Swiss-Prot record:
Protein name stated in the entry: Probable portal protein
GO terms for biological process, alphabetical: symbiont genome ejection through host cell envelope, contractile tail mechanism
Cited function: Forms the portal vertex of the capsid. This portal plays critical roles in head assembly, genome packaging, neck/tail attachment, and genome ejection. The portal protein multimerizes as a single ring-shaped homododecamer arranged around a central channel. Binds to the terminase subunits to form the packaging machine.
Location(s) in or outside the cell: Virion
Bias (Basic and acidic residues): 519-533, 565-576
UniProt keywords, alphabetically: Capsid protein, DNA-binding, Viral capsid assembly, Viral contractile tail ejection system, Viral genome ejection through host cell envelope, Viral genome packaging, Viral penetration into host cytoplasm, Viral release from host cell, Virion, Virus entry into host cell
Region described as Disordered: 374-399, 506-576
InterPro entries: Phage/GTA_portal
Record's subunit section: Homododecamer.
UniProt cross-references to Pfam families, sorted A to Z: Phage_portal (PF04860)
Signal peptide start and end residues: none
Originating species: Staphylococcus phage Twort (strain DSM 17442 / HER 48) (Bacteriophage Twort)
Listed GO CC annotations: viral capsid
Amino acid sequence: MVTRLADIFKRLRLGRDYEDIIDTVPIDDGLQANIRNIEEKSKELNKSLYGKQQAYAEPFLEVMDTNPEFRTKRSYMKNSDNLHDVLKQFGNNPILNAIILTRSNQVAMYCQPSRYNERGLGFEVRMRDLDAEPGKKEKEEIKRIENFILNTGRDKDIDRDSFQSFCRKIVRDTYTYDQVNFEKVFNKKNATTMDKFIAVDPSTIFYATDKNGKIIKGGKRFVQVINKKVVASFTSREMAMGIRNPRTELSSSGYGLSEVEIAMKQFIAYNNTETFNDRFFSHGGTTRGILQIKSEQQQSQRALENFKREWKSSFSGINGSWQVPVVMADDIKFVNMTPTANDMQFEKWLTYLINIISALYGIDPAEIGFPNRGGATGGKGGNTLNEADPGKKQQQSQNKGLQPLLRFIEDLINTHIISEYSDKYVFQFVGGDTKSELDKIKILQEEVKTYKTVNEARKEKGLKPIEGGDVLLDGSFIQSMSLNTQKEQYEDTKQKERFDMIQQFLNSPDDEEPQQESTEDKVDGRESNDPTKIDSPVGTDGQLKDQDNVKSQEGSNKGQGTKGKGNEKPSDFKNN
């Protein structure tokens, strides 16, 4: 190879023809080998990804963040780096607060153990397996867990939040930020024992990132940021993170989608409408009109100045509403300044905004004091089927909004608190609206009439079976069963009668001590005095009882034909 290259350089130096040199340049086998090696490594890399996540959960090009230690919650709004700051600005909206306070009060009804309530309303810790029966040890541990949740800690501390206060806080947090955070504090001596849990401001908790800007999957995954500085870091076990509306969007960085963010336009429109309507009163624009009196040109300017002073002094503010200013002029003319209905349709517009916001939170506007009379704007059209029954509307509203909220809180407690004790227990809210319970009873009544027996229904409720409970409580079914029972009883009676007759027939008179019968009865075949004998028309001699005894007559004739033989007479024989 070296000799070949030296020959080529020599020919080039001497100026010889070099066209044949191009054809004789050897192929670099090493380059092709490197290409093949890269291809093989690429295939091996793809094979190594099998069994691991291949889809991207974060942007391929890492987000350029001014804070490299954590990932902020970004907003679709312009000039906003942290969505938490934007959402916090709308936290004082009256419609949002009406929804939050309503749901908080409803959740607070469940924030005590159900065993403390006569109606069984509250929360309970039970066995995860419904078929498992808790023993004495399990029952004691269940009560201990319930008391821990009720006091938000192992001991009762008046300076610490109760479970009701804790739930009120996280309801506001999840409805504002769609993020709930609470810290779990463990015992200093025993790191496996949790002492208490405390709600934390979610606007200060962020996902931590490594030096490459990627979200940390393990270890100190969460950080608390105050004034754009990291002040504390937590593991997934130490800091609970609850997202009610998760999403797969890469730019979301694992954060949820708040209803406030979705309805941002509606909240801004509501604030603008209230501000516009408020300024209509506060800036003196409430006069109904002007009484204009025409005057000479020299007096017009002076009258205008007087009018301005009078307007500012007498007609500004709420006390100047609906007053009529008067100016000097030659002619009198009234200028109407009262806005028409088309210019101030605030009611329908505000009703529309309230309905949109309420729909996002799954709550009926009537629950927050804005009854909807049909349609998106509260008009007469579009009445719902359940409008005549406010109770049904309220129950449906709670099923859409309250029940999912309770399930969300249940999942938080089970994931981050109950799991610290044992996986065989589960936390849940029980009880509810009385009307709903009555509806369940009505459903159960219909079930036991169609396909479920009484004992099956009692078993589902944890009750013992009762005698005669393996039936359906349906009139037609019970009547049919009664007819079948009567038929079976009739058949049994007939069968018994037949059996008695056969038994009576099979009872032979030889089974008892025979009674003395006269010879005449035996001969004539007359009925015996023995009550055990069957009354038969045939006598013992084989002849009918109602006919003359032939053998008796033959014996009588023979006796008459043998005179002198014996001392007995036929009459004596007969009398015997």
